[in-house]
Each structure stands twice: as C-alpha cells, then as structure tokens.
C-alpha cells in the first residue's frame, strides 16, 4: 500500500469512495494497522481518557501528543497520520499554534486536527500558510464540553444548526483539507457534506459523510464505556481477561513454564 496523502482524501470524495480512519496511540497498534487497508490514523487527544485514565481530554499536554505521535510514526504506516492539537495548544495566539503544529509534524504526523468553528479561521490560515495540512473538527468538540454544557448532541436548535453550517463553510474557506463532524444530527451532517468540496469524516453523525472515524478502543471492545454511536467488532477485554486468568491457573498448577519456555544445561 502506497502512502496516503491529503490529495487522496480529496480524490476519494470526488469518486465517492468512503474514507476510513481509526485512532492509534502506540507503536504496536500502528504496526498492526499498517498492514491493513485503513486510510488514516488519528493520534487523538482521546488518549487522555482511554490510555491515561483522565475523565476528559483537557489534561492532555503537547508532551503527551508528541510522545504518542512519535510512537505511532515509528511504525512507519502508509496511512495518513493526523495528530490532535491538545487543549490550549492553539487557542492562545496564532504564533504558538503554528509552533505547536510544527512540533507535531516534526514528531511524525502528516497533518494536524484542531477543534472549533469560525473562531478558528485565522488560526487555520496561519497553520496552513506554514505548510501544515489542517483537519477541522465541529459538532461536539470534546475540548469545549464545559462551554457546551456536557457531552451532548449538537444541532438541536435552529441557531446551533445554522452555526454548524457556517462553521463548516468558514473552515473550508480557511483551508482545512477535511472536516470531522462529531455527534450531530444526521440531516445536518448530510447537508454539510453536500455543501463542501472537502471530505467530511463522521463520528456519531450518520452514514452520509465521506468517511468514518472511531476510537480504536471502542472498536476492539476495550472501553469501560462505549458511546451509542460506536460499534465493537470484538470483545478484546474479555479475551485479555481470559488469557490472564489462564496464565494465573497455569503458573499456580506448574503448567507454565513448559520445557520449550526455558533452557537446561547439557550434561
């Protein structure tokens, strides 16, 4: 599989070929993904919740994102690597936003993703001007859950719906190459997808986007809580628990290690 680029994303929209994206946070997971036909890896700030055990993404730092981006990049996957910009790494001023985006690219990402709508237009323009591809993210933006009043579906009111559409158009105009739409109503996501020339990637926004993204822990059945819009394709938590319990039994009953697991001196 050849390296996926942002040009491939744009092409897939025109050919109506769905884009597939999953999160990954470490080398072994990225190595497994590298041998699949997945289009893109998102090194998401969701790692704060599913890897580091935080209640939300607000505690994730640039150091965290750089470290995990490097781990994923070391697997040398052909997938497009997109790294999330964590909370307060891009909101303060455009100069620090460009610098932090550059640090993620130096760590191995092919593009960065940031949350927010029209208020992020100047920031997006500055990062793109620096030569760094930007993926937008609207709808439920987890870094802004306090302002939104919690984790909820966005677009219930006409005002919210109009703002989502305006945000999407402003971000496209600012230069994002694609747009994540999270946890909004299916008809809104469909309207946005039809209006934009760039591909949309849905998570909890229905089947009419140009692609889908999931947190890999949800897909593998590893999450403590799986949101309604996610699908588990395997119960890896149960498989891992069973393996650990079997190991305990084998050790206690002297069934592990067996002869093939150690060396004896030759007499």
Curated annotation (Swiss-Prot):
Reported cofactor(s): Mg(2+)
Catalytic activity: 3-methyl-2-oxobutanoate + (6R)-5,10-methylene-5,6,7,8-tetrahydrofolate + H2O = 2-dehydropantoate + (6S)-5,6,7,8-tetrahydrofolate
Pfam families: Pantoate_transf
One annotated GO biological process: pantothenate biosynthetic process
Annotated GO CC locations: cytoplasm
The protein, known as: 3-methyl-2-oxobutanoate hydroxymethyltransferase
Binding site for 3-methyl-2-oxobutanoate: 45-46, 84, 113
Gene that encodes it: panB
Gene source species: Saccharolobus islandicus (strain Y.N.15.51 / Yellowstone #2)
